[in-house]
C-alpha cells in the first residue's frame, strides 16, 4: 500500500493501535468465513440488544432446541440498557462491542460459535407498526434475511462485533505534510482527524476537507519556490533504485517455489490480530502476537506461492504485495498497543480497566500521539511522542452510565 511504502521510506506512522470495532455485524458461522457482514449502526436506533439471563437458555438456542421467541421477557438481559441506563443501546461502538464480547465470553452467546447476541425489533414493531419499521430498515432487513434465511420481523437478528476502521495512519502536520519533505498524505491515509476514536462520516469529512480545502493551498505554497523548476529527469539514481526494488519484489513472488497460498497467510494473520490485538488486549497476548506474526512473516517469504503471470492482470500477485505489508503493519499495531499502558477509545488493555470493566485512561502519562519511525527490516520501530495540547476544551472522560 502507498501508506506503508511511505512509512518504510521515512514517513512516521501514527496511532496504529486505535481500531474501531463495529458492534452490528452478521456473525460468521465457522472458520470457513474470513469476514463478518457489516450492517448499519442505524439499527440500534430502534433495535434492543439482549442475551438470555440463563446460560442454559443460551446453550439451548445455540444447539437449536429453543429460539429467541421461547425466552420470556423477564428472562432476557438487555445488558446495554442495564449497564448504561443513560444511553442504553445507543452507547458508542467500542462500548457496545466490548459489552457484547463480555457476555459471549461469559457463556451467553446465542449461536453455535458462541459469538452472537440478539438485536430485537419486536418492541419497535409493536410501538411504531411494521410498515414504519420497514420504511426505515427494509433494505437492511432484506439483506439480513437473504444471508441468514431468518425473518428479522419475526425472529430477532443475531449480531456480533467486527473490525471496521483504523483511526491511525501516516503522520501529517497541519499542512498535511508527512515527515518526508514534499510528501503529503490526504484523506483516510493519514491519522489527523480522529484521535483514539473515530469521528462520524469520516470519509466524506476527510475527502472534502483535505482534498478541497487544505491541499490545494498547502501543496501550492510548498511548490511556490520551485515554479521555475524544469522537468525532473527520471534518470536519477533514486528512480532507478525504486524501479529495481519493485521488479525484484515482483520477480520473487512469481518465481518463489512455495506451497501455500496468499490467502493462507492472510487468514492466519487475521486470526492472530483478532484474538490478540482486537477488542481486548493484554501484555501477554500482544507479546504472543508479535512472536506469532514474526513466524508468519518468515514462513510467508519462504512458502508463499503466487499463480499466474506477471505482465498481465494478476489479482493474486497484487494480493501478495498487500499481505506482505499487512504482516508488517500487524507487527506495528502490536508494538503500539503494547507501549500504550492504558485503555482509551478503540484501544482496550485488560490490565487497565475499572472494577466495572470500563476503559481506564491514563491521561497523565499517555496524552500523546504515538508516531512510529521505521528502523529497518526485523528492527523494532522507534516511538516518537507528539504531546497533545488542549487549549479551548478541558480533557475529560465521559460516562455513559
What positions do the PLM features span?
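A glycine-rich phosphate-binding loop feature that marks nucleotide/adenosyl-phosphate handling sites
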Residues: 21-29, 158-166, 227-249, 346-358
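Conserved phosphate/anionic-ligand binding catalytic regions in large, soluble enzymes, centered on
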Residues: 77, 191, 204-213, 337-352
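FAD-binding beta-loop-beta segment adjacent to the flavin cofactor pocket
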Residues: 163-185, 189-190
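Long, amphipathic alpha-helical stalk/connector segments used for oligomerization, subunit docking
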Residues: 221-312
Amino acid at each position: 500500500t502507498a501508506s506503508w511504502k511511505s512509512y518504510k521510506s521515512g514517513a512516521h506512522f501514527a496511532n496504529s493501535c486505535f481500531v474501531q470495532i463495529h458492534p452490528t455485524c452478521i456473525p460468521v458461522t465457522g472458520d470457513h468465513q474470513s469476514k463478518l457482514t457489516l450492517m448499519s449502526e442505524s439499527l440500534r436506533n430502534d433495535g434492543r440488544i439482549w442475551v438470555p439471563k440463563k446460560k442454559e437458555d443460551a446453550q439451548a438456542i445455540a444447539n437449536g432446541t429453543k429460539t429467541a421467541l421461547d425466552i420470556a421477557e423477564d428472562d432476557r438481559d438487555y445488558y446495554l440498557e442495564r449497564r448504561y441506563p443513560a444511553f442504553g443501546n445507543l452507547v458508542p461502538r467500542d462500548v457496545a462491542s466490548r459489552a457484547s464480547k463480555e457476555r459471549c465470553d461469559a457463556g451467553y452467546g446465542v449461536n453455535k460459535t458462541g459469538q452472537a447476541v440478539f438485536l430485537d425489533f419486536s418492541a419497535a414493531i409493536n410501538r411504531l407498526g411494521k410498515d414504519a419499521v420497514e420504511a426505515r430498515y427494509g433494505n437492511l432487513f432484506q439483506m439480513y434475511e437473504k444471508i441468514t434465511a431468518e425473518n428479522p420481523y419475526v425472529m430477532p437478528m443475531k449480531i456480533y462485533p467486527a473490525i471496521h476502521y483504523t483511526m491511525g495512519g501516516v503522520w501529517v502536520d497541519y499542512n498535511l505534510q508527512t515527515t518526508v519533505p514534499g510528501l503529503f498524505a490526504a484523506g483516510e491515509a493519514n491519522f489527523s482527524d480522529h484521535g483514539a476514536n473515530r469521528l462520524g462520516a469520516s470519509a466524506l469529512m476527510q475527502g472534502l476537507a483535505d482534498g478541497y480545502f487544505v491541499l490545494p493551498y498547502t501543496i501550492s505554497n510548498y511548490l511556490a519556490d520551485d515554479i521555475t523548476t524544469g522537468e525532473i529527469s527520471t534518470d536519477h539514481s533514486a528512480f532507478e533504485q525504486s524501479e529495481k526494488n519493485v521488479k525484484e519484489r515482483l520477480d520473487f513472488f512469481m518465481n518463489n517455489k512455495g506451497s501455500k497460498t496468499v490467502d493462507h497467510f492472510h487468514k492466519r494473520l487475521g486470526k492472530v490480530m483478532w484474538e490478540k490485538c482486537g477488542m481486548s488486549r493484554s501484555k501477554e497476548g500482544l507479546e504472543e502476537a508479535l512472536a506469532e506474526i514474526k513466524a508468519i512473516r518468515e514462513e510467508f517469504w519462504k512458502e508463499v506461492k503466487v499463480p499466474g503471470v506477471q505482465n498481465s492482470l494478476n489479482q493474486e500477485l497484487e494480493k501478495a504485495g498487500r499481505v506482505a505489508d499487512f504482516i508488517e503493519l500487524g507487527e506495528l499495531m502490536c508494538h503500539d498497543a503494547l507501549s500504550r499502558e492504558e485503555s482509551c477509545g478503540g484501544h482496550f488493555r485488560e490490565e487497565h480497566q475499572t472494577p466495572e470493566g470500563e476503559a481506564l485512561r491514563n491521561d497523565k502519562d499517555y496524552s500523546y500521539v504515538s508516531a512510529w519511525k521505521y528502523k529497518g527490516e526485523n528492527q523494532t520501530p522507534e516511538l516518537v511522542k507528539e504531546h497533545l495540547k488542549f487549549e479551548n476544551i478541558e480533557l475529560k472522560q465521559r460516562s455513559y452510565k
